[in-house]
Amino acid sequence: MAVYTDITEDELAGFLAAYDVGTLTSYKGIAEGVENSNFLLHTTRGSYILTLYEKRVNADDLPFFLGLMHHLAERGLSCPLPLPRADGALLGTLSGRPAAVISFLEGMWLRKPEAQHCREVGRALASMHEAGEGFALTRANALSVGGWRPLWRNSEARADEVQDGLKEDIAAELAYLEDHWPRNLPQGVIHADLFPDNVFFLGDRLSGLIDFYFACNDFLAYDIAVCLNSWCFEKNGSYNITKGMALLSGYESVRKLTAEEVSALPLLARGSALRFFLTRLYDWLMTPAGALVVKKDPLEYLTKLRFHRAVVSSAEYGLRRDEASQ
C-alpha cells in the first residue's frame, strides 16, 4: 500500500496549476512502494507521477534527491525527471505534505531477472556513477557502517526470537566489520537501493532507474555489492556466478574497478548483506500487527551474509580479471 495521504481532484488541479503539464484528465493511486504516497496522473500533455513525501522521509533530504535526479537526467541517464514549478522550484506542498511532479518512465520491473538483465544493470549502475560526478550537493549514508550499531541496538535483545544464537552471531559480525571496513576507496553518488523493483525494463532493454530516496555519497563499489546481493542470488539462497559475471562485466564495460575495490568487494558485500539484514530484522520485530507494511524475511540476508564470509576473492563473484595486475 503506497497511498497514505488522500487528495481530492480539486486540490490536485489547483496544485498542478503551477506546472506546465496541461489539464488533469484522471489520476489514481499507485499500490507499489512503502515510503511515500504516489499517484499516476494523466493530463492533456501526457502521463506523470505525483509523489507526496510522508513522514519517514526527511524533508531536509528532498533537495538532494530531486536535484540528483535532475542532474542525472540532464547527463543522459534514463531516470525520472522532477518537473519545475512556475517559480523554478522542484518541490511544492499538497495536503500538508512536500510534493513533486516527476516524469513518467515507461517499463516494468522484472520478477525473474536473467544474466542478460544483470549485465544491463551493471552497465546502468556504472553510467549512473559517472553521471553523478560534479553533483554539488552531498548526503552521508546513514545506513553505512556507522549506522549499523544503533540499528542493531533496537533489535539485539529479541534477535534470538528469530533464530537461536543470532544475537551472538550478529554482534561478532558487526564488530568485525567495524574493525575492517575500508577507508580509502573511490567515492561518489550511489543509488544504495538498486533492487530489481527499482529498475525498469521494456522487454530485455533497460528503460530506466527509479527510487533514488536512499541515494547518498559513499564508496562506488558498495553500490555494486548491493546489486550482487539483490540481483545474483537465487530463491534457494545460492549465488549465481553467471549473473554475477554478467553484472560485473557490464559495470566494467563503462568503469573499471581499481585494485583496491576488487580486493574490498567481499567485505563490502558482507556489509551490504548486514545492512539489509538489520533493517529487515527491525521491521520484522518492531512492526505492529495490522500495519500497512509488508515485512520481509531477514533470514534471506543472513544466508547471503554467511555466503560472503566464506568468499576469499572477488573472482568467486564472477570478476574475471587478474587482481594482481590491477
Curated annotation (Swiss-Prot):
Pathway where it operates: Amino-acid biosynthesis; L-threonine biosynthesis; L-threonine from L-aspartate: step 4/5
GO biological process, one term: threonine biosynthetic process
Keyword Oxidoreductase: no
Catalyses which reaction(s): L-homoserine + ATP = O-phospho-L-homoserine + ADP + H(+)
Enzyme Commission code(s) on record: 2.7.1.39
Database matches in Pfam families: APH (PF01636)
GO molecular function terms listed in the Swiss-Prot or TrEMBL record: ATP binding; homoserine kinase activity
Family: Belongs to the pseudomonas-type ThrB family.
Protein name from the UniProt record: Homoserine kinase
Species assigned in the record: Sinorhizobium fredii (strain NBRC 101917 / NGR234)
